[in-house]
Amino acid sequence: MIGVVDYGLGNLFSLENALRFLGADFRRVSRPEDLSCFDKLILPGVGAFPRAVAALRETGMFEALKRAEQPLFGICLGFQLLFTSGEEFSLTEGLDLIPGRVVRLEGPVKIPHIGWNSLHLCRPEHPLLEGVREGDFVYYVHSYRAVTAPEFELAVSDYGQTVCGLAGKGRVSGSQFHPEKSGDVGLTLLKNFLEKRF
């Protein structure tokens, strides 16, 4: 059973449609005490880093996610929350499950970064990337990017700067792009998360 973390800031409709298409057994989870009922967790999110952290703290989900032992996959803002800190509006502590910080995209490119971009696979052997090819396109919507060590970067995109598109450390991974909006490539990645062992 997959738990989709619902803390009031995720647009869950597209993600749930993708999970349904893949035949996944899932339900939303909003109480920290229920996390242990699930085999794997997905942390979506749309909006601002500080507001998301505040929402997770208010429900007790922040500390619960830090303690959780299941595989966890973050998407977009949920991906950014996996890192040590975020610099949106003010410096805010993240979940610190993957070392790194979240910083604003730099010009002269258009911000936010909206649209399709190609992937360079840093670790093509990683289970999440099985069936994903060098140069495959995925769909981004974001104004901030994660800066992390190369050892945690699974795939990156070029947008006038390196954008960490996919990162992972142990049981924790996530994507800055939206796999649920990235066609067959995104579905492949989600399927890998559902089926592979981490």
Task: Give a label for each model feature.
Residues G47-G115:
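Cysteine-nucleophile active-site neighborhood
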Residues M1, F26-C37:
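Short acidic low-complexity segments
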Residues T84-Q161:
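Pocket-forming structural segment of enzyme catalytic cores
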Residues E16-N17, V53-L56, T84-E87, F152-E153, ...:
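Short amphipathic alpha-helical segments
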